[in-house]
């Protein structure tokens, strides 16, 4: 999209019925492109997709901008590196361990497929890593936040996600926890599927988040949260820690790879972060 453009502030004329149909068709084409690997347009597409019911001329122009970008940069390759990431275990040693969390979440246990449905392990075990982020109150009209996360198997990007949150959150802390819960749900499903395919998994999924409060509340049993719908996300993440599904650690915002899926960044920052897993 054009630099500085905010789709929610666009007040250009609304499209007619034919224009709406055309807009929806173009969105569908771009979604297909994202599904097969054009992750560099995911954030912009996510923002514009929310206006499919009543798009404006300005929204259509931005769709054309995206197609122009794809024409000028027709190739983007994702790295699929089978080697394990070089992650220092000491990053995940702060806070309470899994056994301590078990004191509160006694029934926490990772769901595993039935033994008769699991084939013999194939190949060597893999590790899974996730980066999660949220752009708090990113929408200038509704003040809804935006969730973004990515999941890796070893060093291979396997899942990418960018979507506006369903609720309006009063704090960055709440929006980040809701993003973390969404990420945990995808992690749980991925781990189940890998086992169904006969792929052994090395320990818990390592999750990186750039919000220190979220990391502290995910790794220290003594923390509490009372806001109802936020506390659901809060306990879901902590339950996953107790079940051994995830381990959570802090990462500097500058190196949070999920940052590109929550908001529009400068060209330099985009290129640096995308350069970690694309070429």
Language-model-derived ranges and their functions:
Residues 1-279:
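Divalent metal-binding acidic/histidine catalytic loops
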């Amino acid at each position: 999209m054009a630099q500085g453009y905010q789709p929610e502030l666009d007040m250009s004329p609304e499209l007619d019925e034919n224009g709406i149909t055309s807009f929806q068709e173009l969105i569908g084409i771009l979604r297909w492109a994202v599904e097969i690997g054009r992750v560099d347009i995911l954030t912009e597409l996510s923002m514009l997709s929310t206006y499919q019911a009543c798009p404006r001329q300005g929204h259509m122009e931005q769709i054309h901008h995206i197609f122009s970008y794809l024409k000028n940069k027709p190739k983007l390759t994702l790295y699929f590196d089978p080697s394990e990431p070089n992650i220092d275990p000491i990053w995940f040693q702060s806070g309470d361990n899994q056994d301590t969390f078990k004191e509160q979440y006694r029934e926490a246990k990772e769901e595993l497929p039935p033994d008769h449905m699991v084939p013999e392990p194939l190949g060597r075990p893999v590790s899974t890593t996730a980066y999660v982020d949220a752009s708090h109150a990113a929408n200038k009209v509704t003040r809804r936040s935006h969730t973004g996360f990515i999941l890796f198997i070893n060093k291979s990007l396997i899942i990418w996600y960018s979507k506006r949150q369903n609720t309006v959150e009063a704090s960055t802390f709440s929006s980040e926890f809701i993003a973390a819960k969404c990420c945990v749900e995808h992690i749980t499903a991925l781990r189940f599927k890998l086992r169904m395919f006969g792929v052994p998994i090395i320990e818990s999924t390592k999750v990186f988040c750039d919000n220190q409060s979220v990391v502290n509340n995910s790794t220290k049993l003594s923390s509490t949260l009372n806001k109802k719908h936020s506390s659901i996300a809060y306990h879901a993440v902590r339950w996953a820690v107790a079940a051994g599904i995830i381990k959570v650690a802090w990462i500097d915002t500058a190196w949070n790879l999920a940052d590109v899926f929550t908001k529009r960044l400068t060209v330099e920052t985009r290129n640096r972060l995308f350069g970690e897993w694309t070429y």
